[in-house]
Regions:
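Positively charged n-region of N-terminal signal peptides that target proteins for export
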Residues: 1-5
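Hydrophobic h-region of N-terminal signal peptides that target proteins for export
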Residues: 7-19
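Short sequence/structural segments immediately N-terminal
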Residues: 19-488
Length: 488
C-alpha cells in the first residue's frame, strides 16, 4: 500500500546520526494521530502506552503517519465515525516503513528473511497442510478450507499471503500474522514488526537473542538453544547489564564488549561495517538444504541481488565481526573446524543419502511421506543434519555432537540402512522391474557401505585402523586408572 504520510512532503534532508539513517521527523504531532490517540487510549491502552514510550512518539511519528492509506490501496478502508474521516489500513508493510527507513527496508526486502513466505509447496508445508493437518478452517478467502496447522504454525514464522476480503478487512486465516516473509496486500514481502515488535519498535528488544528465538528454535533449527549453550550465550546472560543495548549505533568493540548476540554477528555495525538488514551478507554456508551450499547459489535461485556477493566476501564480513573480540588466528582456526564439520556432513551423509533415495524411488510408494524411509531421510537432513551444522557454526558442542552427529549416525545405521535393505528384499521378492530396481539399489548401498566413511559397519577397518583404535582404548583405561597423565 502507498501511504499518504502527511509530513513526508515537507522533509528536506535525510540525517545520518544513526547507522540506520532515517528521514527527518515532523515538527509536531498530526491532528489525525491526536484523534487516534484520544479513542485508542480508552479502547486499547496498551497500544498507546507502548507507543508513548517509543522513539516514534518522541519524533512525532504516530498512528496516522504509519497507518494512513490511499483510497485505491487494496487494504484501505474509511475509518468512519470519526471527526476526520480518513482512509487507513491495518497492515504497515516494509513499503510503508521505507518512507522513513529506506535503507533498512530495502535491505530487508532483498534478503532471505523477506522470502520466507515462499514456503508454499515445500516439504515442510506439505507436512502442515496435508499430512499433519486438514482443510477444516474455512474462511471467506478459503471457502474450501485451509489447514489450522499451517495457519498457526508455519505461517506465523514464515509469513502468510495476506488476503483482503473486502472493505480493507483481512481474512482471519492470514491475519494476524508477523511472519518474517509475510506477503502483504501491497505486493511487498516481509514484516518489520517480526523483529521490531509493535508498538514500541525497540532496537534493544530486537538486539536480544530471545527476539530471534520465536522462530529459530526447535528440532530442525535450534539456534536459540545452541546460543544458550555456547560461550557467547553464557557471556551474554552473565553480563547483560554491560550490553548497552539501547545505544543508537551499537558498535561491537566500541559500545560493548561483553558478548555478541544474534544481531551482533549477522546485522549490527562494526568499526568497519555499517548495519545491514540483509542477514545473509555474513554467512558463508547455507545449511538449510539437504546438502550445504554456498549462499550465493541459493540467492540466485531466489533472484536476490546478493547473488553477486561471493561466500569469501561474506566470510570476511563475519571475520570482521569476530575480530572485534578475537585474534585473527583464533578466527581462522574456528573456520577450519566449521568447514571440516560441513564437509563431514556433506560427504558422509548428505550426498550418499540423496543418491540412495534417488535410486530407491522405483521401490517406493509415490506419495511423499507414505514410506517409512521418507520420514527417516527427512529427519536425517532436516533435523539431525541441520542441528550438527548450525551448532558447528555457532560453537555449540552438545548440539554438534549428541543432538547432531550422534543422532545422525544412530539413525543412519539403525534406521536408514535397514530400511534400504528391507526395500531391496521386498523388491527382489516382487520380481520383474522391482527386482531390477532392487538390484541397482543393492549396488548403490554396497558402494556406500564399503566406502572409507562407512566400512566400519561391515567390520572392514584395516589392521592399522584397528590397532589405532585399540591403542586409544588402552590409553583411556590407563588414564582412568591413573597410570599415565592425560597430557602424556
Amino acid at each position: 500500500m502507498t501511504k499518504k504520510i502527511l509530513w513526508i512532503f515537507v522533509l528536506a534532508v535525510a540525517w545520518t546520526a544513526s547507522p540506520a539513517a532515517v528521514k527527518s521527523p515532523p515538527k509536531e504531532m498530526s491532528e489525525e494521530t491526536k484523534e487516534c490517540v484520544n479513542c485508542h487510549k480508552k479502547d486499547n491502552p496498551g497500544i498507546i502506552q507502548q507507543w508513548g514510550s517509543s522513539k516514534h512518539y518522541g519524533a512525532n511519528v504516530g498512528c496516522y503517519e504509519c497507518h494512513a492509506a490511499d483510497p485505491g490501496d487494496p487494504d484501505a478502508y474509511l475509518h468512519d465515525g470519526k471527526k476526520v474521516k480518513k482512509h487507513i489500513s491495518i497492515i504497515v508493510s516494509p513499503k510503508d516503513c521505507a518512507n522513513c527507513h529506506e535503507k533498512a527496508a530495502t535491505e530487508m526486502t532483498e534478503s532471505h528473511h523477506a522470502k520466507g513466505g515462499r514456503i508454499i509447496g515445500s516439504l515442510d508445508n506439505l507436512l502442515a497442510e496435508v499430512i499433519e493437518g486438514n482443510n477444516s478452517l474455512k474462511t471467506p478467502a478459503f471457502p474450501d478450507g485451509v489447514s489450522p496447522a499451517a495457519v498457526s504454525g508455519c505461517w506465523q514464522c514464515h509469513g502468510s499471503l495476506v488476503k483482503v476480503i473486502g472493505d480493507g478487512q483481512l481474512d482471519p486465516a492470514t491475519w494476524p500474522n508477523t511472519g518474517i516473509g509475510r506477503i502483504n496486500p501491497d505486493g511487498s514481502e516481509g514484516s518489520c514488526s517480526a523483529c521490531h515488535s509493535r508498538h514500541k519498535f525497540s532496537s534493544a528488544q530486537a538486539r536480544n537473542p530471545e527476539n530471534c528465538g520465536k522462530c529459530h528454535l526447535g528440532p530442525d533449527h535450534p539456534q536459540m538453544e545452541i546460543y544458550e549453550e555456547s560461550k557467547h550465550g553464557i557471556a551474554f546472560h552473565a553480563n547483560k547489564d554491560e550490553m548497552n543495548l539501547d545505544s543508537p549505533k551499537w558498535i561491537v568493540g566500541e559500545d560493548y564488549t561483553a558478548a555478541p548476540t544474534c544481531a551482533t554477528c549477522h546485522m549490527s555495525a562494526t568499526k568497519n561495517q555499517d548495519i545491514t538488514h540483509d542477514i545473509g551478507n555474513r554467512i558463508s554456508w547455507n545449511n538449510r538444504p539437504p546438502v550445504s551450499i554456498r549462499p550465493e547459489v541459493s540467492d540466485q535461485k531466489y533472484g536476490l541481488k546478493s547473488a553477486s556477493i561471493k561466500w569469501e566476501e561474506r566470510r570476511d564480513n563475519m571475520k570482521d565481526v569476530c575480530q572485534a573480540c578475537h585474534s585473527e588466528n583464533w578466527v581462522d582456526n574456528f573456520y577450519i573446524q566449521y568447514d571440516a564439520l560441513i564437509n563431514l556432513y556433506n560427504e558422509k551423509y548428505a550426498k550418499p543419502g540423496l543418491k540412495l533415495m534417488e535410486v530407491a524411488k522405483p521401490l517406493l510408494k509415490p506419495s511423499k511421506f507414505s514410506n517409512k524411509i521418507d520420514w527417516t531421510w527427512f529427519e536425517l537432513w532436516h533435523h539431525e543434519g541441520r542441528r550438527a551444522r548450525h551448532a558447528a557454526a555457532m560453537m555449540g558442542p552438545d548440539y554438534t555432537h549428541w543432538h547432531g552427529t550422534y543422532d545422525l549416525a544412530k539413525h543412519w545405521y539403525s534406521k536408514f540402512v535397514p530400511e534400504l535393505e528391507e526395500l531391496i528384499e521386498k523388491g527382489k521378492a516382487a520380481g520383474g522391474d522391482k527386482a531390477s530396481a532392487a538390484a541397482k539399489l543393492q549396488v548403490a548401498l554396497d558402494d556406500m557401505l564399503n566406502s572409507d566413511d562407512h566400512k566400519w559397519y561391515l567390520d572392514k577397518l584395516t589392521d592399522a585402523q584397528k590397532k589405532m583404535r585399540k591403542a586409544a582404548v588402552d590409553r583411556f583405561k590407563e588414564q582412568m586408572d591413573g597410570k599415565v597423565g592425560s597430557s602424556r
